[in-house]
Design a protein with these regions (language model features):
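A conserved beta-turn-beta hairpin within the catalytic core of GNAT-like acetyltransferases
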Residues: 70-82, 92, 136
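Conserved beta-strand-loop-alpha-helix junction that forms the acyl-donor binding cleft
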Residues: 117-126, 141-145
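A short beta-loop-alpha structural element at the N-terminal edge
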Residues: 3-18
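Conserved beta-strand in the GNAT
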Residues: 53, 59-68, 86
Length: 145
């Protein structure tokens, strides 16, 4: 197997299966191409919203999002928020998730984030602990729908 290329998303990644890869988390591939491009352009216009993909042989097989939040506290520092970490089922267990997380943590550090946080389900807690994350607090969620 080829080694994955980890990089920022490009418009052409929709043709390489980006939305199908997101289906591993939640249904994404059913949105229209126009809607996908609208979302893509909105994200690309915000330098604090970065989508990272993993590509093997012209196919997107993993992804995550890094949101960089400017803060008034911590002397105007930044917090990195990791969202939507995904690896296609057939590529899980091959350390691709680790490569994606290492890449995005370096990116957060490059953007001067003083910490990077994420929420996860219990079934992947050990993965993040192995990556150096520490349990810190509880998450509360309010669903608007």
């Amino acid at each position: 197997m080829s080694q994955p290329i980890i990089r920022e998303i490009e418009e052409g990644d929709f043709e390489k299966g980006f939305l199908n890869t997101l289906d591993t988390l939640r249904e994404a591939s059913t949105i229209s191409k126009d809607k996908a491009l609208e979302i893509f352009n909105n994200i690309k216009s915000n330098p604090n919203h970065i989508i990272i993909v993993a590509e093997i042989d012209d196919r997107i097989i993993g992804a995550t999002t890094l949101l960089i939040e400017p803060k008034f506290i911590h002397k105007g520092g930044f917090v990195g928020h990791i969202e939507d970490v995904v690896v296609s089922k057939e590529f899980q267990g091959q350390k691709i998730g680790e490569k994606i997380i290492k890449y995005v943590l370096k990116l957060a550090e490059k953007h001067n984030c003083y910490k990077t946080i994420l929420d996860c389900s219990d079934d992947v807690k050990q993965f993040y602990e192995k990556m150096g994350f520490k349990y810190h607090s509880n998450e509360f969620r309010f669903d608007h729908n």
